[in-house]
Amino acid sequence: MENGDNIMDVKEFWIDVLKQNREKLISYFHKDAVIRWHCSNELFTVSEYIKANCEYPGEWEGKIERIEKTENMIITAVKVYPVNKSSSFHVVSFIKTENNLITEMDEYWADDTEVPEWRQNMKIGSKIWI
């Protein structure tokens, strides 16, 4: 679970999140960790988070788009989508660690959508990715 920076391996963590690997996910968390999904106003214990993640319908893939690290915080921006690519989401995660275990995780999930019509009518901006 550690890498050369002596901090949790967040890439492996995201692989296990996307694979819904219940057995491995628990190893990333301190037993008293708290997880917050701010967009839906939910607070989870570790077991509740793992249940919500691992019992979410479908098979999932994703791509880590950005990782930032400080002494005890990892920030990730990840694009998540079902294997059939019928939809996609972005999640920004603020992962607080202690002794290489997650003690707190604050996540902000958003649906990927088209530009709203009112902004299209303004004819401003351009696509980040196509």
Q: PLM features: residue spans?
A:
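C-terminal and inter-domain tail/linker signature
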Residues: M1-I130
